[in-house]
């Protein structure tokens, strides 16, 4: 069966290159929470710190943790979000 999500996903090394090559980026991915494809503005590094995002693989999916500049902070001031199998990352 044809799986469009897998076909559209970027390679992990290309995503990391885009996310770390500039100050900010736009990342597009399917968000289960919203049941929709979303685009967010983010950074690889938490602002005013040297704390970086990360990449890992879980159950065959590429997971990217990034600082979401569009997000409302939670009670702890956290704006870290995770994107699973991003379709696009651009500066």
Predicted regions and their residues:
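Mixed-charge, Lys/Arg-rich low-complexity intrinsically disordered regions
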Residues: 2-17
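A short, Trp-centered hydrophobic/proline-enriched beta-strand micro-motif
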Residues: 21-29
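Acidic, low-complexity, intrinsically disordered interaction modules
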Residues: 38-59, 74-75
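Short, compact, well-ordered microdomains
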Residues: 61-91
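Short, 15-30-residue, compositionally biased linear elements
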Residues: 17-21, 59
